[in-house]
Structures are given as structure tokens and as C-alpha cells.
Amino acid sequence: MVTPRIGGNKGKTYWYMIYTLENKTGADRNFFLSITAKSDRKKTYSDLFLPSVERAIQRQEGRPLWGKADKFKKLKDKSAGDRKFSYTRIKDGEKRLCVAVFNEFENTSKNITIRTTGLSNDIEVIIDTDGRTLLRERIRLMHLSRPGDEYEVTLDSFKNLRMEWQKETTEIKFKDE
């Protein structure tokens, strides 16, 4: 957790997750990574775009981390047409130390599930018997437990319970429907 002392987010506590992103595919790849979290209290959290918080985390960790601030900085430099899909490029063999930033979790939450999409190209479009368009993709789930005291959450650390790949199907609705 981090609590910035300066900037617009001063005094607010954020939880963050450091992870490594590595391209071992044999070719440069474009990706669109989405990281969300859900508590056992059914509250959901998204990876936030907070440059000042990312800088505070980098100071706390003592190393550079790639996050949403870096992604949007690169996006800003692209032409309007290239910005449309907001993909990020990672070169073959490249390894990035990254950070995802979340608002503080509820004090009473004991279990958190991190959901990551965009790590796999295992995606298929399905038209079901009712004519609906469905997208089935492979997602990564990380199940965490937060043992500890609800009054001293800043001292808590998370325990990895298990990680798994899962297929998820979502209905896609188009604007003209």
C-alpha cells in the first residue's frame, strides 16, 4: 500500500500490485491488458490511471515501474488513428516490471481475486443458436487472501492462494442492435 504525501491524491491510501510482463512468443506483439480486482464483499476495482500515485510507488519501491501513466504517455504520442485501439507494443524477449494501482480495499475484505485479460491470443467469436455474438477468451485469475486485522490493514500482506487460467464468455452488443 502507498499513501502519497504530495499531489492531488495526498493522504489517500492505494493498494498496488507489482508484476512482470514478458514476451516469449518469438515476435513483437501488440497487447491490451486489463486488470481488475473483486473482493469477497462483491466490490470491484479497476487498475487506475494516477501518475502521481505511480511516482510515489516508484519512490517507495526504489525502481522504475511501467504502468498506466506510461501507457497513456505513449498513446498521446501516436497519431489519432493509431490511438483508436490503445494497444501497447512489447518486443520479442522484452521484460517489463509493471504496476497496477487500485483504490484501497474494504477493511473487512479477506479475499481478493485479480482478473487479467489480454495475456493470451486465445480468443474466439461465436454466434450462438439465438444469433447472439459471443466472445470467448482466456483470462488469468489470481486468488489472494488477506489475513490480518481490519483496523491495521496497512500492515497486512496478501497471500497467494492459487492462480488459474479460465475461459470466459461475454455477449457482444453492437451499436445498431
Regions found by a protein language model. Give the residues of each.
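Short, solvent-exposed loop/turn segments enriched in Ser/Thr/Gly
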Residues: K12-I18
